[in-house]
Amino acid sequence: MRRLLQVLLLLGLGLGLVTLGMDYVLRGAVTPPAVVSLRGLTAPVAVSELPGHVLRLNAQSASDAWVAVGYVHGRWHAWPLLLWRQAALGQQAEWFGLSVLPFDSLIHTLRLPTTAKQAFEALPEPTRRILEAYSIGLNAALQEQTVHLRDELVLLNLPIEPWQPWHSLALERLLALLALPDSIDTALPLLAPLRAWLHLYGFRHSVAWIHTGPNQQPVFFQRHVYGNLALPFFQEVLLNYENSSIWLVTIPGTLLFPAGQTERQAWCLFLTSHRARTEQHPRASLPLQPVYERLRLPSGDERLLHMEQAAAYLVLREPVPDTVRVLWWPGLQPISDLSAWLALLTDQTASFQLFDGTGLRIEATGQSQVLGTPSVVEPIPGGLLVGQTFWHRYLARRLRELPLSPDPPSEDHHSLWATERLHLLLTLLDTLHTSDTLIQEAYAFLRNWDGTYDRMSIGATIFETWLAHYQSRYDSLPPFSFPDISLRVQLKQALHFALQDAVATLRKSLGNDPNRWRWEHAHPLRLMFPVWAYRTNLPAAHRYAPFLLPGEGHPSTLRWNPSPLLNDRPAPAHWEGWIYSPPGKRFYVRRWWPQLDRFLERYRTLKRELETFSLDPTNTPLRQFTLQPKR
């Protein structure tokens, strides 16, 4: 009897393993039909999925190419683009209830759906046809059973409504809103929570540079930071049509291309916008008009919102009689940056109105050009760096001192900022008199730390925690220059207290053994899944739990990682790409792309580095199919 039970147990175990293996194989390689019929096409389009989830589209016309882009966006990214559309239309409460109704109210107060629809109607006819072609392909994908059975849509029991051409402009507006600077959050107090809910923020930490390798060949590197979203935010697409070959880094649901290259140029455009401000005016000085928007409630009822607006001015409040506090934002008017994004494909330039349009481009000749007016422009060997925060100046300094290399030095973990600050602070602290052996050990680690934020660094953890406690206690970082002699005693005492607090925190969170205080454990990368991050009672909560990845890097190092010293929400999610000039020769990408429907994917990802792959059209496709006109 015991032997029979053992045999049955082994058979059951074997059957379970086979089932799991089949599930892994089938889910990891869902093969579309060999031929998919679509209305709106004039000729067949060949679709190839290359290694790294890169998509190659071979079309005979630009119109067919945009239909295909819409189709692959819908097939590969249905859940995030539908969620973003629901947010952009101010209809999240219909899906998720009253708790997100304030977000819908914000969207309708800013009139995003209304102005997006008006902006579409104001576009030139050829541009409208591009959006119409894109929506045809996207709707075709959204009607497929494979998309309807996507796990998130099934688990949340969400309906799929048709995609209207102007919906892409609503998403463009939503992203421009999320990209506004934190300084506007006081005027729009719901904006920061909306960013957190969608996990899209931190765009100001994006950076780009061009440097020269040892063979005098320019290398164009760019990094786009976009919050803590665990889902892919970008989709790389190779478009071949009408004798043109264009690499595009696209955002699903939109025709925004933050990165790309044609045969004549490559570009990086930051998803940032500083085109908003608050002002105070006498009421009579503005031609204010009443405007109304309907806010739909989960019950099906509607609430009428009343605002006052004059062109790009929206009244926020009336602090005193006859005086209004207003928000000025171009997104309040029926405009779009679509023409500026499309101009990149034909090597032309056009002005941006919603986004800043700042970034960097390089021509096939090797000539570089700064786009817009980024706040940081620094010379580096054989090129320049453009960025948006003071941290980026330290990146430029580090690039100036590194030896020339054919590879982008984005794996460098050394911080000039930390090295300089540590030297000064240890000089001010001088000697440490304490009987606490753990504080003594921490002090020894600081004195021997080389300013490197790699995974194994213990000094990095102690240093950051030390400064974070000082910042929390005194509302600022320590002065990074020698103060007057009369203030040094006070500063030394303050640094001592902060170090005591830091060690107490590390002891409590990571234990008494400093060898466990490694940077990878103290500050892991935490990537989140929309909705599940805030609704722990949903089905499949374990599958969509946060991804915790080993921490490495810092805002002041070439390897990016958030810091507890930043006053904003940590933004570990990022996409990196680099191109060897002349454009069109070699294009490499590094990013995360979790696939939760694969067996043990969560645990496989934890042991993997960022995936690096080449955007090479000659790569052997993993799968292929054809989009053909529907007769």
Q: Where do the protein language model's features map onto the residues?
A:
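C-terminal/peripheral segments of proteins
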Residues: R2-R631
